[in-house]
């Protein structure tokens, strides 16, 4: 999490945060420190899902320290996870600021410095900060807003010509499922990677019967938990964001993601997805041909067998010298280290990062 903490510590003028769940004391202290040194900090927290109980401690800590903090409109869930610094750059996240999950959960952060995107994010934040109910945000260049993102994400899946790799926490959107099944029937190599959940068994079976590779992780404390929300199309463009594949998330919640073709994002993203595909368990009844991988599988150990990994120094190919490396990035290189079961953080020279669990 160090790169994200560093980003949160970097503002000269302003920091705006919209967060579904905030329970990270380190993040809270950074926000307080920013406020004390004169940065305009505004923190918008979800209130609807739990009546504020999940975020109450963070709300109290920040407000006691004088940090401007507000509850989002409680007519819908504010599931967005975004941090914008100085109106120049935004961290668009699939995960919450909840430290108990950092080492065991698959999530991603993408940095967006596209001026039109950041301006759109700030415009939506200003409206949300005023207490308004969520509505589709300004489109920017690459942004995907909920409410109303289902057609945009289904169209992204439909655009595939070779492969689609998906990670998500939920599978309860007819439009998304139909798009995945349609791709598979027309010969696109489609892979869905999720944590096993009986709630989605019917969807998994239908996807598999239409030729989709369904790769599952057990819902146990020792296994990687798939919380990320990703659609990787042809290893050439990808959606990364907060949207789950459910009617509530796509059509009602406040959510934010983006679609990117940036090589600095796709490199580490494709590597992580490939590792997740190769380390998961294929669903019974799925197609017997090898599942799609965004790039050739990494040699990472399965999440159930943590390994101490050294990710410094970096070899000539931008990888780690250590065998079984999990901390991997594109040709910009990566830095990071982890002990058994701890989180590994990688960052490239363009400031794009992701984290993985051993």
Q: Which residues fall in each region the model found?
A:
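Secondary-structure "cap/kink" motif recognition
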Residues: 5-13, 149-162
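Mid-sequence helix-capping/hinge segment at a functional interface
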Residues: 127-146
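Short hydrophobic beta-strand segments
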Residues: 14-17, 142-143, 163-167
